[in-house]
């Protein structure tokens, strides 16, 4: 059975996103979250009332919220996503285990529950999760920096998540015109250009995307 042009463009965009871009994002997130974890742990250990991420308690989080600091935001994070808190305690936040044992746990705190199911910074991470983490703009420090100052990783990742990943995940045949297909690949390429990767790696990824785009245009 012949594949319609719009269907083919959708499939090619989905496959190219998952095969070319998705595999390189977890390592970038890993580096950023590792830096954030170290920053927060150092900050907590330097406070008059010391604590740490690995020993964090509900009382610590409440106390930190009441005092303006780089850790004041902790209460707003999704602690239900770690230590089986939601499964065991539901919405009873006072009963949660607030220990943040690793950068992976820290990353899971920033995500909605349905995306916080990965166990490492690897292929178990959904691309939507990595794009959300890359696109977030309110970390206490800047943890994702482009190798090119003209590019803003947060905006580029958000653009890909909203206008490529989400649109491909919720298929509507009428969207997948030639113009929209071209725009999707432009957004994917723009994100690659903004990632903190070597020139050689960027060229490799851009070349792969170009080849996939040709497949989407070939009838």
What residue spans do the PLM features occupy?
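Feature for intrinsically disordered/low-complexity regulatory segments and propeptides
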Residues: 1-167, 171-219
């Amino acid at each position: 059975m012949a594949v319609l042009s719009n269907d083919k463009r959708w499939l090619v965009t989905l496959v190219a996103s998952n095969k070319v871009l998705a595999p390189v994002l977890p390592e970038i997130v890993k580096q950023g979250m590792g830096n954030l974890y170290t920053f927060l742990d150092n900050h907590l250990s330097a406070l008059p009332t010391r604590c740490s991420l690995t020993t964090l308690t509900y009382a610590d989080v409440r106390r930190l919220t009441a005092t303006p600091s780089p850790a004041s935001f902790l209460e707003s994070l999704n602690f239900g996503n770690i230590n089986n808190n939601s499964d065991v305690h539901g919405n009873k936040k006072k009963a949660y285990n607030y220990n943040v044992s690793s950068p992976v746990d820290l990353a899971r705190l920033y995500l909605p529950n349905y995306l916080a199911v990965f166990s490492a910074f690897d292929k178990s991470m959904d691309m939507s999760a990595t794009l959300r983490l890359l696109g977030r703009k309110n970390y206490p420090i800047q943890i994702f920096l482009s190798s090119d100052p003209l590019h803003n990783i947060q905006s580029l990742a958000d653009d890909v998540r909203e206008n490529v990943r989400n649109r491909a995940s919720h298929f509507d045949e009428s969207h997948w015109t030639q113009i929209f297909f071209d725009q999707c690949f432009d957004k994917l390429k723009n994100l690659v250009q903004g990632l903190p990767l070597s020139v050689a790696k960027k060229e490799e990824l851009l070349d792969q995307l170009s080849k996939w785009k040709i497949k989407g245009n070939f009838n």
